[in-house]
Amino acid sequence: MAISRGDMVRIKRPESYWYNEVGKVASIDTSGIRYPVVVRFEQVNYNGISGSEGGINTNNFAESELEPA
């Protein structure tokens, strides 16, 4: 499965807040880290950041936790 920047993907990590949600691949790290794929979502999660009204809308995943949407 070749995932590249800009692809729409569905999250398949069951313990993730974003499980079964669709997001857009923002970047892919090739240095060999465990979760190299950064996925950006339209909505924000439940983590509020001090001084902002929203939460976080990106998360890192392994390629094996993603499927094309």
From Swiss-Prot:
Residues in a coiled coil are: none
| Membrane topology qualifier | Peripheral membrane protein
Source species, domain of life: Bacteria
Job description of the protein = Stabilizes the interaction between PsaC and the PSI core, assists the docking of the ferredoxin to PSI and interacts with ferredoxin-NADP oxidoreductase.
Q: Which GO terms describe its biological process?
A: photosynthesis
What is the annotated localization of this protein?
Cellular thylakoid membrane
Return the similarity comment: Belongs to the PsaE family.
Answer yes or no on keyword Thylakoid: yes
Where's it mainly located?
membrane
Which GO cellular component terms are attached?
photosystem I reaction center; plasma membrane-derived thylakoid membrane
- UniProt entry keywords in alphabetical sequence: Membrane, Photosynthesis, Photosystem I, Thylakoid
Pfam families in alphabetical order:
PSI_PsaE
The name this protein carries in UniProt is Photosystem I reaction center subunit IV
